[in-house]
Each structure stands twice: as structure tokens, then as C-alpha cells.
Amino acid sequence: MATPYVPVPMPIGNSASSFTTNRNQRSSSFGSVSTSSNSSKGQLEDSNMGNFKQTSVPDQMDNTSSVCSSPLIRTKFTGAASSIEYSTRPRETEEQNPETVNWEDRPSTPTILGYEVMEERAKFTVYKILVKKTPEESWVVFRRYTDFSRLNDKLKEMFPGFRLALPPKRWFKDNYNADFLEDRQLGLQAFLQNLVAHKDIANCLAVREFLCLDDPPGPFDSLEESRVFCETLEETNYRLQKELLEKQKEMESLKKQLSEKQLHIDTLENRIRTLSLEPEESLDVSETEGEQILKVESSALEVDQDVLDEESRADNEPCLHFSEPENAISEIEVAEVAYDAEED
């Protein structure tokens, strides 16, 4: 048989003044007294063997006015034959005179953050409840279903005409089924909403002890509370590291895009520079070709001039040559004739 569960609360955003009370005499709800850290160590020390499951719960902590105007909540439990209704409507007198209600006299709706299955000696489930007294002061307490049941019994004795409709027990099926635990968590959340929806119930001693309203726990009151505080820091560290990794991936992607854009810009600049240099090169080529054409034309003119000079010289020279041979022949003939005449 498991010993009574000792709650292990953890503050979130506590002010310095909340640590001044004497915490050595703080008692848990309904007879479970925390005498030392060793008494609860056996129940929560091996929490890593359990399976802690966080489920999404609507955040109703900051809007206290929604408690009075919230509709009827209907929850159907796994294996149950009928649905159970959880009413969050305020008392009739408060509905008639809403302006006279002092919202500071009651806490905001506690939120069940999740549950954890403990398997140290006897297997059981604890529910992690976030209690927010003010926007600046909040803490976490751990409660078993047995603690909720004891609170419901006490409230029945104190308020006989009021029924909070606690989710029923489950006798012959697996109490650690995930679907069943989620349904029970929803029912317990509606139960807590009913607690704070009525001023008299929210301010009674049983509820204040259940939520530790008069003696908010500190993060280092016991070994278990320190463990929960360290786990919260680890979760925060993991979340921040995950965000940092995502930012680094995004930065690497942006760097890659930037390098691609820069390469594209360099390519365009080189292309523009090439296009701007092509007209100058064509102009240089045309000038060179023009000079070569001029040189060729001048050379051709020189050649033509030489040819004309040679032709003119050739026209003058044949007259002289033809006249001289005629004279020579006549002389030869005269000489031959004269010689022959002498021989005769």
C-alpha cells in the first residue's frame, strides 16, 4: 500500500517576500505532513523511471472574469456509460450583483500542466498543477487523484448543497492508459474551475491548503522541489538551445542565398564589362585595317608609277636601237661590196 503522497510544489516568478515564511512546518493537504526531505524522497526521487506527459490545457489564469461567464463543461470519460457535466457558473447572488464581487478574494483558476506516473514502490499518478496567485507570483504543486477525492469529501461536508462532480474512480481497467489519464485530467481541470468559481469555497481552509495559498512553496524547500526547479531549468535550456539551432540553420541558409546572389551580381558585372569593351576593340580593328588599306593603295600607286616610267623609257629606247643596226648593216654591205669589187 502506497504511503500518502507528499506534494512537491515549485514557484514560478515568486517575489522575495514569499520566502520569508517558516516552511519547515508547512503541511500537505489532508493529513500528509512533510517532516523532512527524506520522507518524500522515496516517492519522487526516481521520477525518471516514470513517464511524464504534458498535455495542452487552455490558459485561463489571466482572465478571472471568464470564470463567471464560462459555459457548461461536458466531459465523457473512457469506459463510462454517460457524460458528466461540470458547471462553472457562479452563485446566484454573484450573478445578480457582479459589481460587488471582490476578485482579489479568490485565486485565479489553477491549471493542470500534466501528469507523471511514479513507480518507486507503488505505481501511482501525480498531476502537476500551476497555481497563480497574482500575475507576478505563481508556483507548482503536485497532487494525486486521492488528494482530489479527499478534498471533494471535505467540501461535501462543508457545503452539503454543492456538488463539484469529481471524475469517478476506475476499478477494473488500466488506470494508466494515456487516453484515460487525459480524460481524467480534463475532469480535474473542470473540478478546479468549480473551486475558484465560488468565493466561499475558494477561501475555505481545505482549498487553501490544497493549493498552498497561505504558504507558497519555495524552490529549495526540499530535495524534490529543488529537483523540479532544476528540471524546469533543463527544459528552458533545451528550448533555448533548440531555438538557437533553428536560428543558426536560418542564418546558414541566408548566407548561402547571399553568396549565390553575390555570384550572380559578379557574373552580370563581368558581362557588362565585356560588352562595354567590344566597341573599342572593333574601332581599333577598323583603324588598323584602314591604315593597311592606305599602305596597300600607296604601294599600288608606287608600282603603277614605276610601271609607267619603265614603259615611257621603253618607248624611247627602241628608236635608237633600230637606227643604229641599219647604219651598221649598210656599212657592212658597203664594205663587202667594196671588197668584192677589189677582188674582181
From Swiss-Prot:
Residues 27-40 have a biased composition (Low complexity). May be involved in several stages of intracellular trafficking. Plays a role in protein transport from early to late endosomes. Plays a role in protein transport to the lysosome. Promotes degradation of EGFR after EGF signaling. GO terms for biological process: early endosome to late endosome transport; endosome to lysosome transport; protein targeting to lysosome. The modification Phosphoserine is found at S222. Its main location: membrane. Keywords: Coiled coil, Cytoplasm, Endosome, Lipid-binding, Lysosome, Membrane, Phosphoprotein, Protein transport, Transport. Residues 14-26, 41-66 have a biased composition (Polar residues). Residues 223-278 form a coiled coil. Residues 1-66, 83-107 are annotated as: Disordered. Residues 105-218 form the PX domain. PROSITE patterns: PX. The keyword Cytoplasm applies. Residues 1-10 have a biased composition (Pro residues). GO terms for cellular component: early endosome; early endosome membrane; endosome membrane; late endosome; late endosome membrane; lysosome. It is found in: Early endosome membrane; Late endosome membrane; Cytoplasm; Lysosome. Homooligomer. Interacts with EGFR. Belongs to the sorting nexin family. A 1,2-diacyl-sn-glycero-3-phospho-(1D-myo-inositol-3-phosphate) binds at R144, T146, R184. InterPro entries: PX_dom, PX_dom_sf, SNX16_PX, SortingNexin/PXDomain-PKLike. One of its GO terms (molecular function) is phosphatidylinositol binding. SUPFAM superfamilies: PX domain. This is Sorting nexin-16. It is a peripheral membrane protein. The PX domain mediates interaction with membranes enriched in phosphatidylinositol 3-phosphate. Pfam families: PX (PF00787).
